[in-house]
Each structure stands twice: as structure tokens, then as C-alpha cells.
Amino acid sequence: MIFDSNYDLKDESETLRLAQNMAIHLHPSMNLYLKGELGAGKTTFVRGLLRGLGYQDKVKSPTYTLVEPYSLEKFTFYHFDLYRFKDEHEWDDAGFREYFNKASICVVEWPEKAGHILPEPDISIELSHESFGRHIHLMSHTSLGAECLKAAI
């Protein structure tokens, strides 16, 4: 069963709240892909996910480091930003494949920069600027993703 839904978010607090609600239902081995133009709120959404998972320290954008790992109590959360990739093979060359495993959650901003090399996401999230704030499109690609989204919304 696929979950596919759209929501309007009037401000940053609504974006954070939605992400925090979703985080409660995430499981190790899940992959989430975030799409949207620069400044659309992708890193804000990741910050909300991490807050929902109990992480309270600073959340940095991995634009220049490419990946920021967050060691949580039961698993590692990897936040990727592939914006600077010029070629999909840079993902493989960077050795990121090993991060996608049953003991971690991987969240990837700009997944299209890695082409079809990335594993299938459980959930894809697209954020866009609107006159009222932000618009978010949530879509599951696996049954685990659908369960997570249904429970969170």
C-alpha cells in the first residue's frame, strides 16, 4: 500500500512538528530522500527528524562535508547532501554505499545527483516555497515507508 499525500506548512514550526511526528515511526534500515530547491526547508526537516529521535545538539548542513553522522542511542543517522555532485559516480567513489545498512537511517538531500545508483527510498519528501510558507509532498515507496507515514499523519 502506497502513501501519497500533500500538505501546506505555514511556518518553520509546522515543518519541525511534522518531521518530529514522523521520526517517532522511523526504523533502522530506512532511507528517506529529500528534494526541493535551495532554501526549501530540507535541512530544517532533517533537524526536526533528529529532534524527534532525541538528538538535541546542533544540526549542521552537510553541503561541504557531504555527510554528517549522528550517533543515536540505538542506531546511526546519516544526513547526506549531494548538491555539489557533478556526476552520479561521485557517490560510489565516496564510499557511501556502506552507510546504507540495517543498522542506520539514511536521509539524502538532492538524491537526483546520484542518479539511479542510490538504493530505493522508503519515503521521498519534496518541499517547495509557496506564498503562504512551504508545501510538502510525502510519498512512500515501500510498505515500511507507508506504515511510517500513516502512523505519523
How should these model regions be labeled?
Residues 55-71:
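Short beta-strand-centered segment that lines the nucleotide-binding/catalytic pocket of NTP-utilizing
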Residues 1-21:
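N-terminal pre-Walker A segment at the start of P-loop NTPase domains
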Residues 3-5, 51, 86-89, 97-153:
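Short phosphate-coordinating micro-motif centered on Lys-Gly-acidic
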Residues 42:
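Conserved lysine of the Walker
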Residues 32-34:
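Hydrophobic anchor at the beta1->P-loop junction of P-loop NTPases
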Residues 22-29:
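Phosphate-binding P-loop
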Residues 38:
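The conserved Walker
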